[in-house]
């Protein structure tokens, strides 16, 4: 059976793995998932990630990050979904927790944070919020 929202599945697997204090989580890989993992690594929400090719099916393995025994990611939620896409211009991209969190946006120039999209002057689809 095909998955209707693979990005929501990625975020749910990260959330669930952190709730039970797992060190790593594996998800089926795609270009968008790798780009999201890259943004999460750059922003310091996860330690690292790598793509493993098992039997021709690439898997994205994410190493989760903890601080003082608590997950670094306190909140991770999907914004734009298959049934309700959320697009914003560069001036209307929302701030998450007054700039303490990050909105991940996919733009014509690639997947980036809300701050980088505003600085670059491009808008796009708001994929998720991370705080």
Swiss-Prot record:
Alphabetic keyword roster: Ribonucleoprotein, Ribosomal protein, RNA-binding, rRNA-binding
Claim: Transit peptide is one of the keywords in the record: no
Pfam family, one: Ribosomal_S8
Record-level GO BP terms: translation
Top-level division of the source organism's lineage: Bacteria
Molecular function terms, GO-annotated: rRNA binding; structural constituent of ribosome
GO cellular component: ribonucleoprotein complex; ribosome
Its biological purpose: One of the primary rRNA binding proteins, it binds directly to 16S rRNA central domain where it helps coordinate assembly of the platform of the 30S subunit.
Assembly, per entry: Part of the 30S ribosomal subunit. Contacts proteins S5 and S12.
Entry's family note: Belongs to the universal ribosomal protein uS8 family.
Record HAMAP family: Ribosomal_uS8_B (MF_01302_B)
Entry protein name: Small ribosomal subunit protein uS8
Organism: Albidiferax ferrireducens (strain ATCC BAA-621 / DSM 15236 / T118)
